[in-house]
Structure formats: C-alpha cells, structure tokens
C-alpha cells in the first residue's frame, strides 16, 4: 500500500505541475481506485518496520520517476534493454550481500531469469510503449490495475479463493480507472513564437 501510495502521490504531483487537469470526476475516480486498493491489500496486513516502510516508499518514488522518464522515450525496447544492463551489476552486488540468507537451486534460478528477462522485460517494453500517449495522472491510475491482475492470476493459476471483498475491491479499482481515463485531460495550448 505504501508502494502504490508513493507512486500515485509522485505522479499526480508531477502531472499537476506540468499542467494536467484534475476534474472532480477524475479526482473521484482516483480516490475510488485507491480505496479499492486499500480494501484489497490492507485486511490482514501488519505495519512494517520503519526501515522496510521507507524502502517501499523509496521504491515507489523510483518507479514513479521511471514511468515519468518513460513518457519522453522513443524506443521502448532499446530503453528497457539499456535499463536492464545498467541494473544487472547492482542486482548482482545485492545478491552477493544476501547470498548466505537464501537457498538456491537450478530451477529457482531459471524461473527467476524467466520472470525477469522475459515476463518483466516484456511488461516494461509494453508500458514504455504506452506511456508517451498517457498523462502522468492517467498512467499512475492505470498502474493500480496490477494488483487486480495479480489476484486474477492467483485465482486462475494457483486456485486461490475469490471472496466477496476481493471482487468488490477489484470492481472499485476498475471503476475508478474508467472514471479517470474516460475524461481526457485537455492538452495545453502551444504558444507560437512571434516573428521579429
């Protein structure tokens, strides 16, 4: 919840700073989607330690910055590949630090590589492809669909139970997203340079 809250806060502030509009309908949709996320994730959750909470907030701000930067990108595939190359040394260094605390086998390593290099990379390329056509506020709200998709995947592939709470939470999120995306933010008029 801290992670999504940080992403929303940063990207909405960025959107408003850049001149995007936040009408009553869009604001209501944003609040409804966040309420749905809270209802989906909060029950049963415990307050994390301060350090863990700060790390989640930092991760949310980093993802917001990543998304904002992606709006100016031209080649989604090349940008994602470059980001993965730059992130690999950091990931390896962190893995070495925590190596003694984990358990490793061939299947786990292979699944991790498939998850990161295939599934995540494909999702990032798709996200970077869509971002240039989205405003910051719209993009931040669309990201709230991820927990709903993860929940659906758990039901379909892992036989997890589907409760009334999760159904209504997902409906609240999706309704909020529709409210935000249905009303398009007006583009800012471009000022023409005056001739001398």
Map each language-model feature to its residues:
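Hydrophobic residues within alpha-helical transmembrane segments
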Residues: 2, 6, 28-32, 54, ...
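Hydrophobic alpha-helical transmembrane segments of multi-pass membrane transport proteins
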Residues: 13, 39, 54-69, 94-154, ...
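Membrane-interface interhelical linkers
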Residues: 19-27, 45-51, 74-77, 89-113, ...
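Hydrophobic transmembrane alpha-helices of multi-pass small-molecule transport proteins
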Residues: 22-42, 89-92, 153, 165-184
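Juxtamembrane helix-loop-helix junctions in multi-pass membrane proteins
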Residues: 65-87
């Amino acid at each position: 919840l801290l992670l999504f809250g940080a992403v929303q806060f940063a990207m909405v502030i960025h959107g408003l700073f850049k001149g995007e509009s936040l009408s009553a309908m869009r604001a209501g949709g944003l609040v409804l989607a966040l309420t749905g996320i809270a209802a989906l994730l909060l029950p049963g959750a415990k307050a994390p330690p301060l350090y863990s909470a700060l790390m989640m907030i930092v991760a949310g701000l980093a993802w917001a910055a990543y998304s904002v930067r992606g709006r100016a990108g031209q080649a989604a595939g090349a940008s994602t590949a470059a980001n993965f190359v730059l992130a690999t040394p950091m990931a390896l260094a962190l893995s070495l630090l925590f190596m003694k605390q984990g358990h490793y086998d061939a299947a786990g390593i292979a699944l991790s590589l498939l998850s990161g290099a295939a599934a995540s990379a494909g999702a990032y390329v798709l996200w970077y492809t869509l971002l240039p056509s989205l405003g910051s506020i719209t993009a931040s709200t669309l990201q709230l669909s991820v927990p709903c998709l993860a929940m659906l995947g758990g039901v379909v592939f892992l036989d997890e139970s589907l409760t009334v709470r999760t159904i209504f939470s997902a409906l609240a999120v999706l309704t909020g997203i529709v409210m935000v995306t249905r009303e398009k933010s007006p583009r800012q008029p471009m000022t023409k340079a005056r001739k001398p």
